[in-house]
């Protein structure tokens, strides 16, 4: 069933990234080697000196970290380079989000009513598409994109359940995506989620601001 298809999808992604998961191979293209990995090591050094990583003394004679969204200070996978061997923890920040992308696409396809194999295909085609693979060197754009299917799923949950629980799930997904530091992708995710909600819960035969469509906008905004 769907569990077997999801497991097969996760194994497919793992097979694609096996060298990065099982060997000492590192990521290096573009800003990875020149900007983001050095910053991860610098903040790890700050932490090991017993200081909070809110100021980076190694860049530009010192610069604030919390004011620069490119540090992703509040995003959980950023911390992997601080608690694991830095090179491995740092590349996990990238690789784990391909798993998130695949899983999110899979669950979104399942929510749309597709069977196990079509869900597998949806996840595989999305995660291995050219545009997605090309994000593999973007420290913030990859994680924010990885959250897009999950933000849509959270919006769908909000439409079905409503109340504080539904709003909380949607707000949590959107907040984590915002912590990944690329706000334009978050804006696009909200637009995509609203489109999903109108397709599955709206009424194209009713006036735009009436009936089911009005309920969609009201519940969406309340989340």
Where does each model-flagged region fall?
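Polar helix-capping/helix-linker motif
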Residues: 1, 129, 210-211
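Membrane-interface starts of transmembrane alpha-helices
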Residues: 1-4, 85-93, 114-122, 166
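Start-transfer (signal-anchor) and selected internal transmembrane alpha helices
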Residues: 1-18, 215-222
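Membrane-embedded helix bundles of polyisoprenyl
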Residues: 9-12, 99-112, 116-203, 219-223
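Membrane-interface coil-to-helix junctions
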Residues: 12-105, 124-149
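Short, charged, surface-exposed loops that flank catalytic or proteolytic processing sites
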Residues: 163, 210-213
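Cytoplasmic membrane-interface regions of multi-pass membrane proteins
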Residues: 204-209
